[in-house]
């Protein structure tokens, strides 16, 4: 999806690099490029940031011997990270029951976010939104014997939602609230 905007578009590359500095960490949640390994290599040389790739179904270039993996710190299908004391579950495909989903901080705020792509802005995304609301409206009894709602913080990081602009976790959370 990034490649759809960036390939052949100096403005997209300039805008992106205007926000992303050399040492910023950038996690791409799949479908980086529909191009060949050579085309993807060329694109990657022009992007700022320390890059990490969660592989998507269109990232076929990764399996090509001509692809230079050195531009990435790591390439994985799934990862769990920490960002400001929050757990972040990353996968190209949405995971409806993700690790850490029930974890809350001292104030009762969810501590875990599941970031995904793949479904774009499709009927599948509408179904996921319905699932999220059903889950949030479902009550359960916590360890203290109190009734609580089930947290469900799945965020679709579809690049068109952010106008192809790289966003921080806080920015994705805020954008997701407004959608």
Feature annotation, model-predicted:
Residues 21-23, 47-51, 86, 110:
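Short glycine/proline-enriched coil/turn segments at helix->beta-strand junctions
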Residues 16, 31, 56, 90, ...:
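Divalent metal-coordination and catalytic microenvironments
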Residues 1-8, 13:
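Single conserved hydrophobic/aromatic residue that forms the stacking wall/gate
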Residues 7, 28, 115:
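Conserved Rossmann-like nucleotide-binding pocket used by diverse enzymes
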Residues 30-47, 60-72, 99-103, 125-130:
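Metal-dependent catalytic neighborhoods of phosphoester/phosphodiester hydrolases
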Residues 14-19, 42-45:
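Short, basic/hydrophobic alpha-helical segments
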Residues 21-35, 52-60, 156-159:
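Active-site neighborhood of divalent metal-dependent phosphoester/pyrophosphate hydrolases
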């Amino acid at each position: 999806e990034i490649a759809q905007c960036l390939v052949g578009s100096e403005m997209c590359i300039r805008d992106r690099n205007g926000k992303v500095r050399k040492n910023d960490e950038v996690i791409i949640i799949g479908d980086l490029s529909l191009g060949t390994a050579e085309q993807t290599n060329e694109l990657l040389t022009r992007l700022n940031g320390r890059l990490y790739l969660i592989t998507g179904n269109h990232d076929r270039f990764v399996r090509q011997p001509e692809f230079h993996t050195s531009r990435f710190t790591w390439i994985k299908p799934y990862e769990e990270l920490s960002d400001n004391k929050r757990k972040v579950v990353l996968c190209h495909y949405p995971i409806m029951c993700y690790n850490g989903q029930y974890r809350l901080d001292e104030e009762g705020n969810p501590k875990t976010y599941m970031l995904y792509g793949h479904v774009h802005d499709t009927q599948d995304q509408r179904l996921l939104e319905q699932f999220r609301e059903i889950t949030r409206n479902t009550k359960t009894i916590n360890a203290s014997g109190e009734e609580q709602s089930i947290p469900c913080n799945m965020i679709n990081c579809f690049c068109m939602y952010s106008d192809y602009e790289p966003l921080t976790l806080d920015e994705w959370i805020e954008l997701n609230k407004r959608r």
